[in-house]
């Protein structure tokens, strides 16, 4: 399909992308499982979108990869309802605590924390910017105590249109489907992420320039569909970013070699 299959972490039969009800993760080891260096990919479905790339990095560069992702589970240390309900998402809080406890028993070399837009409705309506930021810093701090390195991967923009549906409907007018930069990238967007990473003394990997020009955030770049819906990057596009992400990681002070 448009942009390749969804990451195998969704469908490998182990339940590695934990569903709403889950409070723990299965083992879910990838990459070079015998390697003496371990990286952890942590977050919700946005983190799972990056899985194909870090899976490839870990296989090529000799890392063991632990996939720790859970559906609709914001990384910020805040008490919020499950998306679409009024019920507190206790399974998310329990799962996050479980992951940190797991790593306290077996510390790792790198934790990759993937955040999502702070202005998703559920967070924007319930928490101030300061509360959101302190919740993110709290999560980052908890990983600093269990990992040699922590990197915060910045959120990718939320489009106004479902990319694949829009491309199918307007194949000859893709401009209609692109996100306009000023519409989909709030001005304080990266500054808040950078500040949070600085406060927690962790590394930061910006993503806006990977998916947007100064004018728009296109749904197609070259031969690759960028988004599979309004917010998740496609497998093919993520893999296409390999060299750029390698450079960005090095610039952030993380060398996977």
Predicted features and spans:
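Extracellular/periplasmic envelope-modification machinery, especially enzymes
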Residues: 1-257
């Amino acid at each position: 399909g448009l942009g390749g299959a969804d990451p195998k972490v969704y469908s490998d039969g182990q339940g590695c992308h934990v569903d709403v009800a889950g409070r723990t993760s299965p083992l879910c080891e990838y990459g070079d499982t015998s390697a003496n260096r371990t990286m952890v990919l942590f977050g919700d479905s946005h983190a799972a979108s990056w899985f194909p790339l870090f899976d490839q990095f870990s296989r090529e560069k000799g890392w063991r990869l632990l996939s720790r992702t859970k559906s609709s589970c914001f990384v910020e240390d805040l008490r919020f309802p499950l998306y679409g309900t009024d019920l507190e998402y206790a399974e998310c809080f329990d799962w996050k605590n479980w992951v940190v406890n797991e790593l306290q028993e077996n510390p790792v070399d790198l934790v990759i924390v993937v955040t999502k837009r702070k202005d998703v409705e559920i967070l924007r309506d319930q928490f101030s910017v300061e509360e959101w930021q302190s919740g993110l810093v709290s999560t980052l701090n908890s990983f600093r105590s269990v990992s040699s390195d922590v990197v915060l991967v910045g959120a990718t923009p939320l489009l106004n249109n479902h990319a694949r549906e829009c491309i199918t409907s307007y194949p000859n007018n893709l401009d209609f489907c692109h996100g306009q930069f000023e519409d989909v990238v709030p001005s304080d967007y990266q500054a808040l992420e950078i500040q949070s990473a600085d406060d927690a003394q962790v590394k930061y990997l910006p993503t806006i320039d990977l998916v947007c020009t100064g004018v728009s955030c296109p749904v197609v770049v070259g031969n690759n569909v960028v988004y599979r819906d309004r917010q998740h990057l496609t497998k093919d596009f993520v893999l296409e970013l390999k060299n750029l992400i390698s450079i960005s990681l090095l610039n952030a002070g993380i060398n996977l070699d």
